Amino acid sequence: MKKQAITVISTALTCFLLSNVGHAQEKPKQYYTVLLKDPSKFEQGITEIKKENGEITYTVPEIGLIQFKGDTQISKNQSPLFESVNPSLQVEKPEVPHSIKMPNLSTLSTKTLDTNLPPLWDMQWDMKEITHNGESYKKETGSHNVVVGIIDSGVDVDHPDLVKNLIPGSKNFVPKGGLRGTEPEETGDINNINDINGHGTLVSGSIAANGELKGVAPDTGIRAYRVFGNKSADAAWVINAIIEAAKDDVDVINLSLGSYYVNGKVYENGKLVDNGWAEVEGYKRAIEYANQHGSVVVASAGNDSVNVANKQELNNFLKQKYEKEGKIFTGVGIEAPGELPGVVTVSSTGPTGQRSVFSNYGEGVIDISAPGGDYRLWQQYGEEVWWNTGLFRQEEVLTTFNTGRYLFAAGTSMAVPKVSATLALIINHYNFKNQPKRSISHLYKNGIKKDIAPDKASLGNGQLDVYNAIK
């Protein structure tokens, strides 16, 4: 069972705005998040915040979440409407490790004999493994009747491998001015889903590429829900995107992101930072909302090689992270949204079938694993040999990238979309639309390798097998 009683303070992957001691006129206004006890009292909550001179900056009325800017933090005790109040949390923008622009395809030496498979197929060790060398495509490739919503940095709308499956209805959640007004290039246009970062395009290719590359579900519809510009995102944007994707009748919601939180207290410069769990409770409410509206939510386990089920190990990891930031904490850490109820949590494996060296793990946390690449060869031979001899092609996964390019990358972010795409195939193949529990149960029972007894801490219910999921 996944942990459900959560208090959020801060995280190594999440930025935290802390209030400072001093006179109000001597410090800039800070951003705070309020979660209401009863979302139906949303307008009353807005009124209460404005009474305290709070400037409303972002809202998610469906779950009673409000972000405001103010001189001082409002205590949750100031109103019986407030469940929690804390400095607003940010989710750091996802990192894109490096891009490799592939050579002209006509110069590639390829052994691909099946004319139904694309020219770069021989470089897709991950897809060959989970599709039984493309056999799953003969059974099911998906349709636009089933949609995967990708909450990320947007998508390259002109990428030739993706354009056929990018269906209408994508949305931008980065507001005008971007993060706290620091991105003047962000206009707040709801239709701006252009991927500046590139991470969302990487994820999209693993799901629905259908060109020089092939994704798991090459005829499945995708929508981009853009929450990252050039900088980090407020967690409220991600929460809002989950809600909106569910309202848009998205079948599978892909979250190739995650952060660390603490159930306890955090101190900075000897000062106690008030406890708060608005964003984590907001995530929980949004995920429950999505499940109730028929959407499956899939999230990554994280990339720090930590046993997140072992709270002592996780706490030691977070302690080291916090010390670098001049902070100390007491309490218990958690990875979210991966550890939250109602989420399919994915770890990463490499070409050997072992858990990737970077992947988080933990029995009772990991639900399933999928190929996301590895760095064992990099560790064995060193970076120079790994690059110069092309060893990276043997363990990183190839996917789509911005401006029509392709990229070799690794991370749990590359494992999650394969599971999301497989769920989309299951929903389409078995007509499981609006039946998230049934779809997930089928995945865990059938969509895994049958000949391998899984290490539950690393692989959960097992290693993803797309062919088995739909045969």
Language-model-derived ranges and their functions:
Residues T33, Q67, V147-I151, G205, ...:
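Structural recognition of the beta-strand scaffold that forms the well-ordered cores
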Residues L18-P28:
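Sec-dependent signal peptide cleavage junction
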Residues M1-A5:
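Positively charged n-region of N-terminal signal peptides that target proteins for export
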Residues Y322-A424:
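Extracellular S/T/G-rich loop segment that most often corresponds to the catalytic His/Ser-adjacent loop
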Residues D114-S206, N210-P218, W237-N240, K247-D248, ...:
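Active-site core segment of subtilase-fold serine proteases
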Residues K138-S143, K214, A233-L255, W277-S300, ...:
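Mature extracellular/periplasmic domains of secretome proteins
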Residues A24, Y32-D122, P351-Q354, Y361:
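Autoinhibitory propeptides
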Residues V250-L257, Y261, N428-K471:
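C-terminal subdomain of the subtilisin-like protease fold in secreted/lumenal serine endopeptidases
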